[in-house]
Amino acid sequence: MEIVINNVKNFSKWTLHNFTEKLRVFELRDKSDAELLKLLDDLKQELATFRVSKVTATGTSKLSKITLVRKAVAKVLTVYNQRKKEEARKKYKKLSKTPLNLRPKLTRAKRKGLTTKQLTMKTIKERKRAENLPKRKYALLA
């Protein structure tokens, strides 16, 4: 599997049974969704083989690689899910109502609190009083 990104050959080292180095997230961001899913399948397959070897106790050297592969799976899933969420945000930006998981994460009090427009609103009586009775200005005689 050889992919050319920005005139550099990347991921030739990421073939099955060869996940020895850390996976770099900035390299993953350049990949398409199909490539990410393919890489995810390869990683999960690799993880399954490592777990089998752990149970059968055939390769003790492979035990340390389990954490690397697990973290690589998490990185691929994170990049993929972030991309999907951004696409959903763009889709719902024009619409008046957005799903709860795309809204900003706030505390319950801030979610239930009044908006700035509601805070600045005045009753009719307050408006009339402000109009007809301006603030008094006092001059002090020195």
From Swiss-Prot:
One of its GO terms (biological process) is translation. Pfam families: Ribosomal_L29. One of its GO terms (cellular component) is cytosolic large ribosomal subunit. Keywords: Ribonucleoprotein, Ribosomal protein. The keyword Hydrolase does not apply. GO terms for molecular function: mRNA binding; structural constituent of ribosome. InterPro entries: Ribosomal_uL29, Ribosomal_uL29_euk, Ribosomal_uL29_sf. Transmembrane segments: none annotated. NCBIfam families: L29. Belongs to the universal ribosomal protein uL29 family. PANTHER family: 60S RIBOSOMAL PROTEIN L35, LARGE RIBOSOMAL SUBUNIT PROTEIN UL29-RELATED. This is Large ribosomal subunit protein uL29. It comes from Theileria annulata. The gene is RPL35.
